[in-house]
Amino acid sequence: MLKKDMNIADYDPELFNAIQNETLRQEEHIELIASENYTSPRVMEAQGSQLTNKYAEGYPGKRYYGGCEYVDVVETLAIERAKELFGATYANVQPHSGSQANSAVYMALLKPGDTVLGMNLAHGGHLTHGSPVNFSGKLYNIIPYGIDESGKIDYDEMERLAVEHKPKMMIGGFSAYSGIVDWAKMREIADKIGAYLFVDMAHVAGLIAAGVYPNPVPHAHVVTSTTHKTLAGPRGGVILSAADDEDLYKKLNSAVFPGGQGGPLMHVIAGKAVAFKEALEPEFKVYQQQVVNNAKAMVEVFLERGYKIVSGGTSNHLMLVDLIGRDLTGKEADAALGSANITVNKNSVPNDPRSPFVTSGVRIGTPAITRRGFKEAESKELTGWICDILDDASNPAVIERVKGQVLALCARFPVYG
């Protein structure tokens, strides 16, 4: 018999201390990595439940194991809530990650060697959109599109490349682009050449759910997302469609299971169900609008302090600070800010002369700081501190002063109160 009072602290103090230290780090550091967020205690409760014990290969009502009557309820709740949230007629909540959701789409719609048009990683795309080091770049013929001199997606170039190469699939979505994507324009181009339009909305799914960013679901043949990031749920993936195409839905389901995965993680799917319910609440819309407001406030200060922002601003949750021409690399900026308890990530910028391991930029996002209660005033104050460090990154006195200010601000806005 397993005793209910068994705990990590008594049995495995090394692991317990690591968990406690990470909890403290999250409370005492300002999180500005655009892909990170804080999930709710309700989501964590679901993920720590006995659902982790249950194997459930297959789909609700069509399982390969017995005893699935209650996990069927859990998965059906997640599916129906995801469909309601994004206006879809199909949802698969089983992908373990956004990348696995993306790989399922490739498997369902393409054959190895097929041509795909995807956003250049150096211009803001994602590894799974055709990077040579990723399965997508190794198995498929990738044609990259990018941004123009203004930092906006170049739809003329996209259309020219589409007509020239006639890809079987076009990919929309990004990991480091601060503008609005014209999903309708992309579908128009896809229809012109008879291609599938696949959108990876992982970074902006929460904004889309709240109606503060355009929804790709009505335009794309298939859409994927992570369930964390702006959506603030557990780490995982989801596939959506409103194509009203049962054959497509069957292909997608088969590509997830048995094509790419075995048993789904039912405790994570329960966490997704909770997160989707939270995202349907009115306060979630308020939160997402504040995410965008905070990002715009940060951009305002960066520009005032003389820093270049790729695209010149932001219409979502993130911004890319371009350090080309400054005596500071993205790697150095990342480290200096980290020493002051401000967590960002180094990031390549368009036409970056430095390697992806060094870079000439940093990516900054506002989902996590907004989750802990920051508004425009705190966002602007924080950006001023960031600029102080970037202006004088080798000065330990500046870093120490900002670290003290960060700790005081974190104490005012705890993550979990």
Curated annotation (Swiss-Prot):
Q: In which pathway does it act?
A: One-carbon metabolism; tetrahydrofolate interconversion; Amino-acid biosynthesis; glycine biosynthesis; glycine from L-serine: step 1/1
Primary localization class, coarse? cytoplasm
Q: Where in the cell is the protein located?
A: Cytoplasm
Q: Which domain of life is it from?
A: Bacteria
Q: Which PROSITE patterns match?
A: SHMT
The cross-references to InterPro entries, in alphabetical order and at most eight, read: PyrdxlP-dep_Trfase, PyrdxlP-dep_Trfase_major, PyrdxlP-dep_Trfase_small, Ser_HO-MeTrfase, Ser_HO-MeTrfase-like, Ser_HO-MeTrfase_PLP_BS, SHMT-like_dom
Among the entry's GO cellular component annotations, what is one? cytosol
Matches recorded under Gene3D superfamilies: Aspartate Aminotransferase, domain 1, Type I PLP-dependent aspartate aminotransferase-like (Major domain)
SUPFAM superfamilies (alphabetical):
PLP-dependent transferases (SSF53383)
Any one Gene Ontology molecular-function term assigned to this protein's record: glycine hydroxymethyltransferase activity
Q: N6-(pyridoxal phosphate)lysine modification sites?
A: 229
Q: What does it catalyze?
A: (6R)-5,10-methylene-5,6,7,8-tetrahydrofolate + glycine + H2O = (6S)-5,6,7,8-tetrahydrofolate + L-serine
Q: What cofactor does its activity depend on?
A: pyridoxal 5'-phosphate
Q: Pfam families of this UniProt entry?
A: SHMT (PF00464)
Keyword terms: Amino-acid biosynthesis, Cytoplasm, One-carbon metabolism, Pyridoxal phosphate, Transferase
Q: Where is the signal peptide?
A: none
Spell out the coiled coil positions from the record: none
Q: Which family does it belong to?
A: Belongs to the SHMT family.
The role this protein plays is: Catalyzes the reversible interconversion of serine and glycine with tetrahydrofolate (THF) serving as the one-carbon carrier. This reaction serves as the major source of one-carbon groups required for the biosynthesis of purines, thymidylate, methionine, and other important biomolecules. Also exhibits THF-independent aldolase activity toward beta-hydroxyamino acids, producing glycine and aldehydes, via a retro-aldol mechanism.
HAMAP family in UniProt = SHMT
Q: What is this protein called?
A: Serine hydroxymethyltransferase
